[in-house]
Amino acid sequence: VEAEVLGFLPNWLVEDAAVTIDTDLLSMLAFHGVEASGDGRLVTSKPSGDVPDGWQALDSEAFVALKAQAQADGVRVVLTIQRFGWQEGTLERTRALLGSRRDRRALAERIAQLVSERGFDGVNLDFEPMPEDLADEYVELVREVRAALDAVDAELHLSVDVVASLTGYDLAGLTADDAADLAIIMGYEFRTDGAQVAGSTAPLDDPEIRDIVATLDEALALVPAEKLVLALPWFGAAWSTETEQAPSATMSGRDIDGGASPSYAEAVAQASLTGRQYDAAQASAWTAYPNRQCATCPATWRQVWYDDPDGFGAKVDHALGRGLAGVGIWALGQEGGREELWWTLRHRLRPQIDETPPGGSASIDPESIQGDLDGRDVVEGVASLRLFASDTPDGSGLALTRIGLSGDLAEDGQLITGRTYPASERIEFPLADEETGGSPEAGPRSIHVQWRDIAGNWSPPLVLEVMAVDPTRSETPGDL
């Protein structure tokens, strides 16, 4: 599949992204970024006199090396120019900039000069939010940037970021022949920290709120599909909730943990402790666990929602299936060195027949073993598992782990009774949970462990024999 794959690289994640970034899959890398002021300048110093973080990262050895390698691998590296108006007073400066023809042109010329001096392959404009009464002025700015770039090199690329509501953005004008090459729809933050009901920050299809399907319906009625890229989140959302079920109302208060946006890696780490569930309509994984901010604080549940290989893959499929130019990622580095989202992207863009399941080994963490009884490791309420799994060299890559206390299999090869987890090296598995075949009674347990790859192949289960001496003694940790 020939598709644009745009990876946003925030200045604070340059070193993290360098660990796993796959330049073989990326077509465009957007360094995020340099701020535009309200009077047509590029902000080069903070009020304190310090150099802004974006400029520091721009000059860092890590980014210089990453940029050079990406361009050598054929990736277009562009510079994001940002202008945020979400905080009090900042939107007025956006109004001042867009309302001044002189300042717009000055900014366009400065952007083109910086791109030329630093050897970038284009520009990504991230102006948000966009008041509806400034839609025309923003189109004019984009045209002026296009003209300034063309004066340097007509091959320089130009894209614009658009918030998911689409409010204030004239998509047709922004992507006209004399304007941007692409509009990047930010397909996330449909739910934010203040959401009343927990759920995906990027729901594919959700009858309760605006979602990706509805957003693309609206956008495709305005511009051709090949002008659009759908950016997807490599981060999640967390709330305190009334129940462990979905949907659940969120809770707030002085003694209750508020909403948060954990990275993909942080969300996966939590699901490795408390299990992974999946909402097929929203195309999002989630996990829930009991939570209390302090010893005397109210008891709540905590829900964490995130896109794992299944959710991310479903949204990539949807975008490409509707003919979009491609997909984007916010943000590189949030995967924390994990590779399964990259594997998912590869499997979607370059699918190969994969009918071979992954394989692996499993053992009980020696530090959690209380002794030996009748040849079985003695454990208490939770089995701390060490897992080592891999897919075949030509396989689609690891996606999930499933663990249960019964070996009965469904037609697709997965354990009928069990709990699903991310494909992690360490998993905490409770032995008293009846939903997984457990019991509060002490006695022997047969722990069945299997893995699934991104193509959907389940491995035959491995079996660990343990003796549970106090199954009810278990803790479900969490801190997101």
Label the predicted regions.
Residues 1-111:
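Glycan-recognition patch characteristic of GH18 chitinases/ENGases
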Residues 39-58, 130-267:
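Substrate-binding surface in catalytic domains of secreted glycosidases
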Residues 108-137, 185-189:
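Active-site groove signature of glycoside hydrolases
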Residues 352-480:
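Low-complexity, disordered linker/stalk regions enriched in Pro/Thr/Ser/Gly
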